[in-house]
Design a protein with these regions (language model features):
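Short coil turns that delineate tetratricopeptide repeat
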Residues: 18, 52-53, 87-88, 122, ...
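Canonical tetratricopeptide repeat
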Residues: 26, 61, 96, 134, ...
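Conserved structural position within tetratricopeptide repeats
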Residues: 14-15, 48-49, 84-85, 119, ...
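Hydrophobic/aromatic packing residues within the alpha-helices of TPR/SEL1-like helical repeat arrays
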Residues: 10, 44, 79-80, 114, ...
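TPR alpha-solenoid repeat register
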Residues: 22-23, 57-58, 93, 127, ...
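Register position in tetratricopeptide repeats
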Residues: 33, 68, 103, 134-137, ...
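Residue-level recognition of tetratricopeptide repeat
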Residues: 29, 64, 99, 137, ...
């Protein structure tokens, strides 16, 4: 198959030029994607501390393997210890550790390192736009909405046609019942740019729901749940619109789906249990 063929050529290349370290990273990625974690760990031993760039790649990948094989807390502890050994980390390493903290929901730490990279990044580069987007998302997750909005709007000043930034900011405004009209306009623009993205489809459907355009909302939310049947938020949203359209048995079915999903958050599960019993309040 493609996996075995790819590895064959990588091994051949390594045999012919064992000093071409990049090939080892491709082999690691192959094993990682194929969930052969022990072989991935074995190949990672080729990356030595003397080579800062590739050794940091090894640390990141080992942290990911720890998360897969053991737990995320141990993974975060490992990468933090290794990061703290670096006396003068470059922007790439700072960016990576910020992303790791963000993905681990350690948003204050993520913000600290994103800020360091932002302070050195080119003012109008796409990289700076991405940094504002990531830091803005971190601020949003801890409820610092003014700072979040500033960062996300700054990202859009640099890259006004980034569908994902438009989507994130607009959805945040919807959740806060803030600037609904502008949020819908942003989502319509995001949808025109990425009409097949399930997250954007869900967001625009939810915007129409909040704007009480229920038939319009159902069309988008149905498509979102078809594209992401295992996403708890999408199932929750689709259940809500079905309830509004008086399709209550179906609504409870989709709400019930959420209870079976591992990544459904605790407060969402509590809310779903109430809705299954009582339906939507004031509806």
């Amino acid at each position: 198959d493609n996996f075995e063929r790819s590895n064959f050529y990588l091994y051949l290349s390594n045999f012919l030029n064992s000093k071409f370290i990049y090939n080892y990273s491709l082999t690691v990625e192959n094993y990682y994607l194929n969930e052969d974690y022990e072989k991935a760990k074995k190949i990672l031993k080729n990356f030595k501390k003397e080579d800062n760039f590739y050794y940091w790649y090894r640390v990141k990948k080992e942290a990911q393997l720890i998360a897969k094989q053991r737990n995320k807390k141990e993974s975060l502890n490992y990468i933090t210890v290794e990061f703290n050994k670096i006396s003068n980390p470059n922007d790439k390493i700072l960016f990576d550790i910020a992303n790791f903290y963000k993905n681990s929901k350690k948003y204050e730490e993520a913000i600290k390192y994103y800020t360091k990279v932002i302070n050195t990044a080119d003012d109008i580069s796409e990289i700076k736009s991405d940094l504002f987007y990531r830091r803005g998302g971190s601020y949003e997750r801890i409820g610092k909405y003014e700072k979040a909005d500033d960062d996300l709007l700054n990202a859009l000043k640099i890259d006004p046609d980034d569908a994902y930034i438009l989507n994130y900011l607009a959805y945040s405004w919807l959740e806060r019942d803030y600037k609904i009209k502008e949020a819908i306009e942003m989502l319509e623009k995001a949808y025109s740019l990425k009409s097949n993205d399930p997250y954007i489809i869900d967001s625009i459907g939810w915007a129409y729901y909040l704007n009480e355009e229920y038939f319009k909302a159902e069309k988008f939310l149905k498509r979102a749940v078809e594209l992401m049947p295992n996403d708890p938020i999408v199932n929750d949203h689709y259940g809500d619109i079905l309830w509004k359209l008086d399709r209550k048995i179906q609504a409870r079915y989709f709400w019930g789906n959420v209870l079976e999903m591992d990544d459904a958050e605790k407060d969402m599960i509590e809310n779903i249990n109430i809705k299954i019993i009582k339906g939507l309040v004031n509806s």
